[in-house]
A protein has these predicted regions:
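Active-site metal-coordination/substrate-binding segment of hydrolases
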Residues: 45-49, 54, 64-167, 222
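N-terminal capping segment at the start of a domain
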Residues: 1-34, 174
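Short acidic, glycine/proline-rich loop/turn micro-motifs
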Residues: 28, 89-91, 232-235
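Short, hydrophobic/amphipathic alpha-helical packing segments
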Residues: 41, 98, 102-105, 242-250
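A non-catalytic alpha/beta surface segment that caps or lines the substrate-entry region
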Residues: 22-68
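Short, conserved glycine- and acidic-residue-centered signature motifs
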Residues: 37, 91-97, 237-241
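Midchain, well-structured core segments that form catalytic/ion-binding scaffolds
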Residues: 127, 131-286
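Generic non-transmembrane alpha-helical segments
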Residues: 9, 13-16, 20, 43, ...
Length: 286
């Protein structure tokens, strides 16, 4: 088979998947447990079936396709990525890795190759954390790090919990722990991914091999102050939560630069309470 045929099929699959967005023409918005996510999941299932995989969707919404190996008892080789996105995100973020994993399985099938151990293609649900502010939901469930209490705790900006969103999506959150894989059952994991930074593009390099991976920590900080009238409260009598928060925020990027070891930092969300233009904020979250 010519490489052009393979890359052409991958491109065709990606072009099809990118249509499942809530913001056509303005980047990809495919939040977890939505209509767009369901459409993408079903399309991935169809591709996996065509590639000869045994297909299922687990209790966390992960789409999983298995090619049985000569010795299924061995820890599997897993390959894939996520199928959700941020708001107005890149068209191929995540789905490139899922589609490439399925193509690997297809090539094994077409060439009559049976792997030594199971090969598993996966599309993870809610890696980004855009809707509920958490992230790694599907992969976390596979590791046994998600339970019913977790699903009830986290909510989106409309007050919908992961628990209720899963029920609307057709999943049973009471069975979330069923998504856990036995310890040691995954031997290797591979992910093909778009470059999300500017380095390879700026250096005109087509591909890079990752030798380490980013460890992400997320925090929600709440600064407490006191609400006052913005027009009549003197500056020296204010307890302005925003004033205090911005002083901290301005230092965060400086701390990352001072480390000079590749550490990065981002404050991507700021919210004030009560949020009025003429009211000194009593709370500021970032």
């Amino acid at each position: 088979m010519e490489i052009e045929e393979v890359t052409g099929r991958i491109a065709e699959n990606l072009e099809h998947l990118k249509r499942y967005t809530a913001t056509p023409g303005d980047g990809c918005t495919r939040l977890p447990f939505t209509k767009e996510a369901r459409e993408a999941a079903e399309y991935l299932k169809s591709l996996m079936t065509e590639a000869g995989l045994e297909v299922r969707e687990d209790a966390a919404g992960n789409v999983i396709g298995v090619m049985k190996g000569e010795d299924p008892a061995l820890p599997c080789v897993m390959m894939g990525s996520h199928y959700d996105s941020v708001v107005n995100g890149g068209d191929f973020d995540g789905i490139a890795g899922a589609v490439c994993a399925i193509e690997v399985a297809r090539q094994l099938k077409e060439k009559g190759v049976t792997p030594k151990r199971n090969f598993v293609a996966v599309g993870f649900c809610d890696e980004e954390g855009m809707r509920f502010g958490t992230g790694y939901f599907g992969s976390g469930a596979m590791l046994g790090n998600r339970d019913v209490e977790y699903c009830k705790k986290f909510k989106d900006t409309d007050g919908v919990s992961i628990y209720d969103a899963m029920k609307s999506y057709g999943l049973d959150p009471e069975k979330i722990t069923d998504a856990k894989w036995p310890e040691g059952s995954i031997g290797h994991f591979l992910e093909a991914h778009i470059e999300q930074g500017p380095v390879l593009d700026a250096e005109n390099i087509e591909i890079g091999l990752v030798d380490c991976i980013v460890g992400i920590q997320r925090y929600m900080v709440t600064v407490h102050g006191r609400a006052d009238h913005a027009g009549t409260t003197p500056m020296d009598m204010r307890l302005d939560a925003v004033d205090a928060a911005t002083k901290v925020i301005s230092k965060i990027a400086d701390w990352a630069r001072e480390k000079a070891d590749g550490t990065v930092s981002t404050v991507g969300y700021i919210n004030t309470v009560p949020g009025g233009m003429n009211i000194v904020a009593e709370e500021c979250q970032f």
